[in-house]
Design a protein with these regions (language model features):
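Membrane-spanning beta-strands of outer-membrane beta-barrel proteins
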Residues: 27-29, 63-64, 109-110, 167-169, ...
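Flexible, solvent-exposed loop segments that connect beta-strands
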Residues: 44-58, 88-109, 139-166, 197-210
Length: 224
């Protein structure tokens, strides 16, 4: 009976170890994720250049979209991740002296990012927190001005349009994933991007702004 109990315990231990190894995130594996991401700009805008009402600024509203990532495990702890997604559409609103005018335009943007990540805890741990950092490329396009913008910048004239630049920035992140089984896992992360841009109006005025958004996302992932 005693020998049988010892043998049973050894078999159970081996089974648990095998299950843990099957669920491990180890060197050479590829992880893909699909989820929802919300970008919350933290705008600090310069004044719109003359001719304009002194103290005229802009703010940019939050936007959400589907996102996806592909991650390669370089070692059991270090990985590189490519992050992309569907375009985001942000409303641009007046701020400062023109805060009361409401929406003055809109802009679409995509911001693919490459992150070098470090994962904590053992490779076979059910939950693994991680940190990351890397470059972000932001492309702004499809920018439109509103009637309110024209009323402020070019009253009585043709509609005012907005032009935006393409910019590079840097992103840091903190997140974690929880393994459901040997392939599937859940993931959540918070990212902070440091980036600035310049908006130029068809009427000649311009403004520069630090966007520095926070992104919050949740996703489901699969390990190959």
């Amino acid at each position: 009976m005693k020998k049988h109990s010892i043998a049973s315990a050894l078999v159970a231990t081996a089974a648990l170890c095998g299950a843990g190894a099957a669920q491990a995130q180890v060197a050479g594996e590829v992880l893909v994720k699909l989820g929802w991401n919300k970008i919350i700009p933290k705008v600090k805008s310069d004044d719109l250049t003359a001719p304009s009402l002194p103290g005229s600024k802009i703010d940019i509203k939050s936007a959400s979209a589907l996102f996806f990532t592909a991650t390669y495990m370089i070692t059991d702890d270090i990985s590189v991740e490519a992050l992309g997604g569907l375009p985001y559409k942000h409303d641009i609103v007046g701020a400062g002296a023109v805060a009361g005018v409401g929406k003055i335009g809109s802009v679409h943007q995509v911001s693919p990012t490459i992150l070098l990540q470090y994962r904590f805890l053992a490779a076979d741990a059910p939950f693994r927190p991680y940190i990351g950092a890397g470059p972000t490329f932001a492309k702004f396009y499809g920018t439109k001005g509103s009637a309110a913008l024209t009323a402020v910048t070019n009253p009585g004239g043709p509609p005012t349009t907005i032009g935006g630049d393409t910019e590079w920035g840097g992103t840091v992140e903190i997140g974690g994933n929880y393994k459901i089984d040997k392939h599937w896992f859940l993931d959540a992360a918070v990212l902070k991007t440091f980036i600035s841009t310049k908006a130029t109006l068809s009427t000649g005025q311009s403004t520069s702004a630090k966007l520095n958004p926070i992104a919050i996302n949740a996703s489901i992932g699969y390990t190959f």
